[in-house]
Amino acid sequence: MFLLLQILYILLFLNLADTSDDEYRLLKDLREGYDPMERPVSDHMKPVNVKLRLILQQLVDVDEKNQVITLVVWTQYTWNDYKMKWSPEEYGNITSLQIPFGTLWKPDILLFNSANEHFDSSFPVNMVVSNDGNVLFAPPGIMQFSCSLSMTWFPYDEQVCYLKFGSWTYGKKLDLRIDDADLPEGHKMDLQYYVPNGEFDLISTPAFRKSTTFLDETYVELYFHMHLKRRTMYYGLNWIIPSILISLSNILGFTMPVECGEKVTLQITNFLSIMVFLAMVSEVAPPTSESIPIIAAFFSFAIVILGVSICVSLITVNIFYRHPKMHRMGDWTRYIFLEWLPWFLLMSRPDHVFRKPKREKKKEEEEDEESNAGGKEEESELISQKQQRPRLLVNSQIVMDSTIPYLEEVIGYLKVFKAKLDDDEEEEEEILNWRFMAMVIDRASLFLFTGLIFGTTFVIFAACPNLFSADQIIETEPVIT
């Protein structure tokens, strides 16, 4: 048994030695007379046909502030080298070889809109050569490329970016084409190994080929587009809904009584909270004046509304604590805020009848005094008639004359007391009128600012072109190897 194992081991070793020897001979024969600077074409007038296939693995990051997108991509180049052909039967049935980077000719294809500090970030891997002369070069790399990101509809935005590939020096000597074999309709990137991104959905990956002229030389360029759509759940739950709730809680401040002392404090706190959300948007958006993100416009309108509501609340507090000795309510103010606006807002004061101001009462009293002047003349005539009565009434008249001054004095005190009570009652009435006016302004502000917030929110977000659109999202299953 042991002898059999030794024989098998020797045969295996001899087979490996033969294979290694065949591979060595093949490499030696292929390298003989080969110059990696020479284009692999038999006719120098013909271009080298190179196919490019992008294998997208992951969308790493979308940097809106710096307008840079980071991808993990495998760039697969294929071309035919006529000097790399051999007959497998002559070399131990070897059909492919792994040749180190730099040994063979390689197209100088670069990502033109690269934002990487090293420009070309691909890793120099080996080249795979087949016996028919086909060369496969698939270097992986982390690509960073610039893209003009439009933040107008952020966070309900869609972005279309492209990767621009082309030869740096060969011009028309290199015919660059898109390798889209076995790819779905409308997709020019290989998404077999794509890992979905948590912030953006990949909608489509079209591509096209374009020829340009530079310094009297024709160059072929390939544009690989990426249609991205932002996922909005995070921003809706953490930005938009909280800001709407903060705005509504600010409106509820109009239902708080002025005496509690926290009315304006609540609104100022909400105002500062919205300012924090606006600062968060400024951290994400690029410092450009081309467009304002729609969510920044929403926060700006919310800040304006909250600022105006704070001013209205301060005016309400001022009106609430007004005193009739310091401020006089005008006739139009009284009519609008104590009669018409309460009627319009369905507000009423229980068991209350609006009284005329004191100045109007004085006018009526003056008119009453003028009308009573004739009564005093009649009273003097009656007194003269009494003086002509018989002497039987003299004693009673004397008694009445002696008590009249005391009665007049008592009546005078009663009038003063009544006037004091009337003044106090009217003053209290005016104080209540000012307070009721403040309540009316609060109620009107409640309805007005509620309508403004809901109306502004609806108008702004209804303008989003893709708020309710349902694009077909590319979904890939994980590849298990």
UniProtKB/Swiss-Prot annotation:
GO terms for cellular component: acetylcholine-gated channel complex; neuron projection; plasma membrane; postsynaptic membrane; synapse. The chain crosses the membrane at residues 236-256, 264-284, 292-312, 444-464. It is found in: Postsynaptic cell membrane; Cell membrane. It comes from the Eukaryota. Residues 356-384 are annotated as: Disordered. Residues 20-235 are extracellular. One of its GO terms (biological process) is regulation of membrane potential. InterPro entries: Neur_chan_lig-bd, Neur_chan_lig-bd_sf, Neur_channel, Neuro-gated_channel_TM_sf, Neuro_actylchol_rec, Neurotrans-gated_channel_TM, Neurotransmitter_ion_chnl_CS, Nicotinic_acetylcholine_rcpt. This is Neuronal acetylcholine receptor subunit eat-2. It holds the Pfam family Neur_chan_LBD. Its main location: membrane. PANTHER family: NEUROTRANSMITTER GATED ION CHANNEL (PTHR18945). GO terms for molecular function: acetylcholine-gated monoatomic cation-selective channel activity; excitatory extracellular ligand-gated monoatomic ion channel activity; transmembrane signaling receptor activity; transmitter-gated monoatomic ion channel activity involved in regulation of postsynaptic membrane potential. It is a multi-pass membrane protein. After binding acetylcholine, the AChR responds by an extensive change in conformation that affects all subunits and leads to opening of an ion-conducting channel across the plasma membrane. Nicotinic acetylcholine receptor in the MC pharyngeal motor neuron involved in pharyngeal pumping. Has a role in the determination of life span possibly via calorific restriction which affects growth rate, although this is independent of metabolic activity. Disulfide bonds join 147-161.
